[in-house]
């Protein structure tokens, strides 16, 4: 009986790991698929903004589902909440798949956006449940934390591979490129969601006791009574926009073989530009993975505040260099062109923007730690509000690509530059708790 329970836990852990990866997979699917829709509406004058709409719909779901997801977890428990998220994810990806059947027109695009929105609900629900569920299966403590670190690594790895895989399937964007060209990744997503639902359905998972102290706790105030939390909410909103906007717009930039794009170098368009763009964007996520691994070794020696100052300072320098140098100089990067690995010439701006992945890798946890420090019993409410603010990952890239359409790709990076400047301010002064007189016990 004990062996049966142990084997069940191993299967549950593996399933949760796959879901951890799927969260990043579904989230990072929107930007590379946006290359297809951007091309479909290339003559609209707002192609980049249109291409980023799928990403916007994905993150917009957090605004509506952030707090309800937490309430759902409390009401029906970890397992049923996870199953709800998995089923919702399956439906969302299925709708995106069906959008290809409607054709490359406004009707197909509308169906795709609806699918991206539903997928956003799924990702939000899974984000709410996967972390604590892995901790629960691991028995808490160091073992539970270890499982979450492994899951986070798979999450980053999935974020790295997704734009690369989609880019390789698309190759070079042409007038004939359609949603059906990325059916393989959608099939993979559907299969993983279906398998996870079946496996998890048959695994007994005991929910922890929830809600006993909450009902007895008196809340005289709210997280909004704390200035450093209010400023932290803005910081998390703009951070997610920076994290998504930098590689998403970079993918569009490299995939664009017109004179304005990074895929047009020295008078020659790049062959397989979409594949190269996806790989370059994937390298950004790879550096985020590297940054998270490295920072885990120094987190006990360097404060969140100091890491934020260093990361945002370096990030601003990288963005300024990218904007100033643009395509004036080129560098060679190892990329997969869709057929083989090669050294490919890309604008030097791409290299500096990719390096920003090292900077953004530590920001979520650092902002969360700084913004919730000293909140005590208000921390749970603060977490729900933070989950809603992930919507910044949809809205800020939309603003950035509106600027890209009207003023150029490099000019659009003024958006993440301003956002990083704000986060630098938050680390220097905004994170200080000046409301210590408010009781939090």
Where are these regions (language model features)?
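Extracytoplasmic
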Residues: 11-43, 130-131, 246-254
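Extracytoplasmic gate region of multi-pass secondary transporters
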Residues: 30-31, 162, 224-282
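Central cavity-lining transmembrane alpha-helices of secondary-active solute carriers
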Residues: 52-71, 282-294, 392-395
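Conserved MFS/SLC helix-loop-helix module at the cytosolic interface between two early adjacent transmembrane helices
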Residues: 64-109
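C-terminal ends and interior cores of transmembrane alpha-helices
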Residues: 87-105, 313-342
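Intracellular juxtamembrane helix-capping segments at the cytosolic ends
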Residues: 125-139, 360-376
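Helix-loop-helix hairpin linking two adjacent transmembrane segments in secondary transporters
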Residues: 144-204
């Amino acid at each position: 009986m004990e062996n049966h329970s142990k084997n069940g836990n191993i299967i549950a852990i593996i399933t949760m790991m796959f879901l951890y990866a799927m969260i990043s997979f579904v989230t990072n699917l929107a930007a590379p698929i946006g290359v297809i829709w951007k091309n479909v509406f290339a003559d609209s004058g707002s192609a980049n903004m249109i291409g980023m709409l799928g990403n916007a719909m994905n993150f917009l779901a957090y605004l509506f589902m952030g707090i309800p997801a937490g309430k759902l977890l409390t009401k029906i428990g970890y397992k049923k909440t996870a199953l709800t998220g998995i089923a919702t994810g399956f439906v969302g990806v299925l709708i995106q798949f069906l959008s290809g059947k409607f054709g490359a027109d406004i009707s197909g695009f509308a169906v795709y956006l609806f699918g991206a929105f539903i997928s956003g609900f799924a990702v939000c629900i899974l984000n709410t449940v996967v972390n604590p569920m892995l901790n629960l299966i691991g028995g808490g403590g160091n073992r539970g934390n270890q499982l979450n670190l492994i899951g986070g690594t798979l999450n980053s790895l999935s974020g790295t591979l997704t734009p690369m895989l989609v880019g390789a399937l698309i190759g070079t964007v042409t007038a004939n490129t359609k949603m059906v060209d990325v059916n393989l990744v959608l099939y993979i997503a559907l299969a993983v969601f279906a398998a996870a639902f079946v496996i998890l359905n048959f695994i007994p998972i005991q929910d922890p006791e929830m809600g006993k102290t909450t009902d007895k706790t008196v809340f005289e105030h709210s997280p909004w009574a704390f200035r450093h939390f209010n400023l932290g909410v803005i910081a998390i909103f703009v951070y997610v926009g920076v994290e998504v906007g930098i590689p998403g717009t970079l993918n569009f930039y490299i995939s664009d073989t017109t004179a304005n794009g990074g895929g047009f170098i020295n008078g020659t368009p790049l062959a397989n530009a979409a594949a190269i763009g996806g790989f370059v964007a994937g390298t950004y996520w790879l550096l985020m993975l590297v940054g998270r691994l490295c920072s885990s070794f120094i987190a006990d020696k360097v404060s969140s505040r100091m890491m934020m100052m260093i990361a945002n300072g370096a990030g601003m320098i990288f963005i300024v260099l990218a904007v100033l140098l643009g395509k004036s100089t080129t560098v060679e990067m190892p990329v997969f062109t869709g057929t083989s690995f090669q050294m490919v010439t890309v604008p030097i701006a791409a290299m500096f923007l990719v390096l920003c992945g090292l900077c953004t890798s530590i920001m979520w946890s650092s902002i969360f730690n700084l913004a919730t420090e000293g909140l005590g019993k208000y921390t749970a409410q603060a977490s729900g509000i933070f989950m809603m603010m992930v919507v910044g990952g949809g809205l800020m890239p939309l603003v950035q690509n509106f600027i890209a359409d009207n003023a150029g790709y490099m000019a659009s990076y003024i958006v993440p530059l301003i956002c990083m400047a704000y986060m630098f301010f938050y680390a220097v002064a905004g994170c200080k708790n000046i409301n210590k007189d408010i009781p939090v016990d």
